[in-house]
Regions:
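Pol beta-like nucleotidyltransferase catalytic core
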Residues: 1-84, 95-282
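A short, histidine- and acid-enriched strand-loop-helix "catalytic/donor-clamping" loop
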Residues: 87-91
Length: 282
């Protein structure tokens, strides 16, 4: 008969936080490098012999909203925090059940007004300080940021106008319909947006597509699948990572997340579209 495993050693000075689902791995939290180091995250619901009320906090992810209520904890204490955590849009996981009214104490989401921010990405300056996302972002002057010769060379060798890699078709944001209308306008300038992935007849491996965008495309279509406030996903990064300007489409104020808003004088004039066409044909 195998020996009974020892009871886990619980430290009074630590906060124990239970992740209700096994949806996210604990190492995700380690990567956040939180300055508070007395918190212990766990998936072990039996840490207190099944008494969930003993945890200092419980994280519930978006999938909890789809669970029958009998699968959720019943007993809780007034000092215990129930935290709703998600990086998914509210359209995909709406919290419409009356059961969840006054159920959560805190939120941990991509929303800028969340109790705990959980964005898809952060923007740092050259010294490592986080600039965005934030309600009031102080973007540095672009003139103070040097452009390396390597970047200039990559941009000079591009030949295609815009591309898009997409796998989720017929999204709630109607981005497919918007793209169709945009293609109609670009046709008059002999330009087009090349679409790759599950929603197109053109397929390529992810790594091959990334190399192609880096080599060929000036612009990348960063279209979100939902129009939600502050919802900015990694799609913007696909443009930046491939030395392409992301063209954004979503419900967020992108100047709070990833893009410095230019003055109206610096916005592209209609004749510049024609200039891009001529450059492509040279």
């Amino acid at each position: 008969m195998a020996p009974t495993p020892p009871e886990p050693l619980l430290l009074d000075s630590h906060k124990y936080i239970l992740s209700w689902e096994h949806y996210y791995i604990i190492s995700d939290y380690d990567d956040l490098q939180c300055p508070v180091n007395n918190c212990i995250f766990t998936h072990d619901k039996n840490l207190y012999n099944g008494d969930y009320s003993q945890f200092d906090a419980i994280l519930f992810y978006e999938r909890s909203l789809t669970l029958p209520v009998e699968y959720l904890p019943i007993n809780r204490t007034s000092s215990q925090l129930y935290v709703f955590a998600t990086i998914e849009s509210s359209y995909n996981y709406p919290a419409c059940e009356l059961y969840f009214d006054n159920f959560f104490n805190w939120t941990m989401t991509y929303r800028l007004n969340s109790d705990i921010g959980w964005p898809y990405f952060v923007v740092r300056n050259l010294t490592g300080h986080i600039l965005a996302p934030s309600v009031n972002v102080k973007w540095p002057n672009h003139k103070d940021i040097p452009i390396s010769p390597n970047v200039i060379e990559k941009l000079a060798n591009k030949t295609r106008a815009a591309g898009w890699l997409v796998s989720h078709c017929r999204a709630e944001s109607m981005r497919d319909e918007y793209l169709t209308r945009l293609q109609e306008h670009l046709y008059h300038f002999s330009l087009q947006i090349d679409v790759f992935g599950a929603c197109s007849n053109i397929r390529c491996r992810y790594s091959s597509c990334e190399e192609m965008f880096t080599r060929d495309y000036y612009f990348y279509m960063a279209f979100e699948n939902s129009f939600d406030e502050d919802y900015v996903t990694e799609k913007v990064l696909h443009g930046y990572d491939n030395y392409a300007v992301p063209i954004v489409y979503g419900g967020a104020n992108y100047t709070s997340s990833a893009i410095k808003s230019p003055s109206r004088k610096r916005l592209a004039k209609p004749h510049q579209v024609e200039a891009i066409r001529l450059h492509r044909n040279r």
